[in-house]
Amino acid sequence: MPRPFPRFEMPLLALALTGMALSTTACSRTDESPAADAGARSTQDWSALKDFTEIDATGPDNVAVTIGSGFAVKADGDARAVADLDIRVKNGKLVIGRKSKGDWNWGRKDGDKGATVHVTMPAITAAALTGAGDFDLDKAQGERLDLSLTGAGDFRIGTVALKTLSVDITGAGSVKIAGAADAAKLSITGAGDIDAEALKVGTADLSILGAGDIDIASDGKVAISIMGPGDVTVKGKAQCTTSGVGPGEARCAP
């Protein structure tokens, strides 16, 4: 009688199943990796937030403000960034930040690509930006607008019609603004820039401590103080008085 062949069916089956299991595990790990989620985007709504006239934004995220009827707050962007947002109203101020704080990425977590917070509000009187985000405001009018910038972010302001405007920059950020104001106080500490060439003011108090630059337009009295290599340019028929120390230059010309 012929000798039967060895029975390898079960070991081969076991090896096949083991290979399938390893393959499935590898696929599962690939799907759950950070790289697979890096492109995920999401949107979140904070419809209950209202009754604020100021905004305080801290972190790496961008803010886009539209002046309109009623209040609306929503965010979109990297899903990880949106999930990490902390937005609330405190003492008439919309406070925007991150749940995770204190790292060198100004709050960014696990390399997320950031979010944009979209805000609609009837009027705005003040905005503070700390970090590396950008702040866009379509327009503003009324008694005053106070802008404070700390870090490397940017303010981009559309057309304003104000009685008083205050801008304070600490760091390397920039502010671009147009329109008109009866009086303006603009201050830079560091290497920031204020592009207000399209802003016509009645009177102005301009101050630079560092290497920043200010451009503005005025036909009124303008007081200029420069400590360092910063420059001030005033277009129009302004009556300028200057003071300071350093190589910085003040130019007042039509």
PLM regions and their residue ranges:
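Short, surface-exposed interaction patches in beta-rich subdomains
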Residues: T159, S174-P254
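Conserved acidic catalytic centers in enzymes
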Residues: G59, G151, G228
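Acidic (Asp/Glu) and glycine-rich low-complexity loops/linkers
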Residues: P2-L12, L17, L22-T130, D134-S148, ...
